[in-house]
From Swiss-Prot:
Catalytic activity: cytidine(32) in tRNA + S-sulfanyl-L-cysteinyl-[cysteine desulfurase] + AH2 + ATP = 2-thiocytidine(32) in tRNA + L-cysteinyl-[cysteine desulfurase] + A + AMP + diphosphate + H(+)
Name of the protein in question: tRNA-cytidine(32) 2-sulfurtransferase
Gene giving rise to this polypeptide: ttcA
Placement of sequence motif PP-loop motif: 47-52
One annotated Gene Ontology cellular component of this protein: cytoplasm
Description of how the protein assembles with itself and partners: Homodimer.
Length: 311
């Protein structure tokens, strides 16, 4: 066997493992939050970025073996940004045989009119886009709206709200839409961004840049993202532990009177969640909670994944 053939086999092996991991992560999120039910029509919001492409690919994969029946319809919002390649998504989706709808709305013109030059337009653009997607979901008869936010997005939002908003508020894997009519789901909630990036590179998705509008990036979010990436590099397992913490909230040991009845504590009240452990020595695990090193972690970094199809 030649060296090139050996490398190709390793690439294929690692890509298969990567897809299985993403599939497992998505499957667990769907099960934990009851994201998809029998007969659901899922509107998959496709932006042309790595996250939404990966979400569509994994949902299509799960659809083939899921114990329930559900359908997918991909939706892209063409916001009339200069240079937007209108042909890319239709060609890609037609090749896959996926039902889709391209919604054309000149939100770019509205945003440029309302936001001063050089300012971040993402907030207004997001609000406009959200309203259009809700309307489209109604028109298509969709029961769920799937967005491509992943675990890193959720953690970034948590820290943004803590650092700048004074709230412990993240990005829920499942929620009711602002108009009270649609259920929004985030199937990639348990997926790592670096896994999604590797998968997108390997599959050679036709990525559409997200900066066509010319808007400046959200500086605060970028600072948080850089901080989390640095932590992940220097302290393996810290990201996993923080995400686990979001799933293990103890209201009695925080300070929110809306979540726990502190005023109701009187003599004779029972001990809740271990009582006062503030001055006790905590038993700190040797490894971060929720973290298991991937056996192929180094291999995935070393190998260039260029296999397009997973058998």
């Amino acid at each position: 066997m030649s060296q090139n053939q050996e490398i190709s086999k390793k690439e294929q092996y690692n890509l298969n493992k990567l897809q299985k991991r993403l599939r497992r992560n998505v499957g667990e999120a769907i099960a934990d939050f009851n994201m998809i039910e029998e007969g659901d029509r899922i509107m998959v919001c496709l932006s042309g970025g790595k996250d939404s492409y990966t979400m569509l690919e994994i949902l299509r994969n799960l659809q083939q073996s899921a114990p329930i029946n559900f359908s997918l319809v991909a939706v892209n919002l063409d916001q009339k940004q200069p240079g937007f390649p209108e042909h890319v998504l239709p060609e890609y989706l037609e090749k896959l045989g996926v039902e889709y709808k391209i919604v054309e709305e000149n939100t770019y013109g509205i945003v440029k009119e309302k936001i001063p030059e050089g300012k971040t337009t993402c907030s207004l653009c997001s609000r406009l886009r959200r309203g259009i997607l809700y309307r489209t979901a109604t028109e298509l008869g969709a029961t769920k709206i799937a967005l491509g936010h992943h675990r890193d997005d959720i953690l970034q939002t948590l820290f943004l709200n803590m650092f700048y908003g004074g709230k412990m508020k993240g990005m829920p894997p499942k929620l009711m839409s602002d108009d009270g009519k649609h259920i929004v789901i985030r199937p990639l909630a348990y997926c790592r961004e670096k896994d999604i990036q590797r998968f997108a590179d390997a599959k050679a998705f036709p990525i559409i840049p997200c900066n066509l509008c010319g808007s400046q990036p959200n500086l605060q979010r970028q600072v948080i993202a850089d901080m989390l990436r640095d932590w992940d590099k220097r302290y393996p397992g810290r990201i996993e532990t923080m995400f686990s913490a979001m799933q293990n909230v103890v209201p009695s040991h925080l300070c929110d009177t809306n979540l726990f009845d502190f005023k109701g504590i009187t003599h004779g009240s029972e001990v809740v969640n271990g009582g006062d452990l503030a001055f006790d020595r905590e038993e700190i695990p040797l490894q971060p909670v929720g973290w298991q090193p991937e056996e192929d972690e180094n291999q995935l970094d070393e190998l260039r994944l260029n296999v397009v199809e997973v058998k």
